Amino acid sequence: MCIRDSTHIYPTNLKLQKNTINILLGSTLAGKTTLMQIMAGLDKPTSGEIWFNNENVTGMKVQKRNVSMVYQQFINYPNFTVYDNIASPLKITGVSSDETKQRVGKVAELLKLSGMLNKKPNELSGGQQQRTALARALVKDSDLILLDEPLANLDFKLREELREELPKLFENR
């Protein structure tokens, strides 16, 4: 698979099993983020195909793919509260307000955000903003969740906690 004639990603075949956690390792500039962007539909391969759940999704629009992604450089909606940032993918897909409240509460508790749900991103530390972006990806019932170094900006204690807690969250999916 080749992107923009500058990044080559090897091997060309990658198979991910449903309900598993897979880790993509590589050196800086090896193409890990590029591969995840291709899988999410945010970038297109110059050759090859992307298959997910036995379906060719290479040309599928981003909105049609049930994928969540968190970048190392997190992104939050600056005018939304933490609650609204986390709930945004649920609201877009028409999840009821009761279920939204329950799911946001669960992921907020896991990521130690419960006391911050009424705050805006500019009132949070960098680690709290990263956890908000992570919560937004985890709250949605995605077929594929792509995490690009999601724990990199967190303090040591929380990073270690989440290394243990994240797999538990996926066990219930």
Regions found by a protein language model. Give the residues of each.
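Conserved beta-strand
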Residues: 4-17, 48
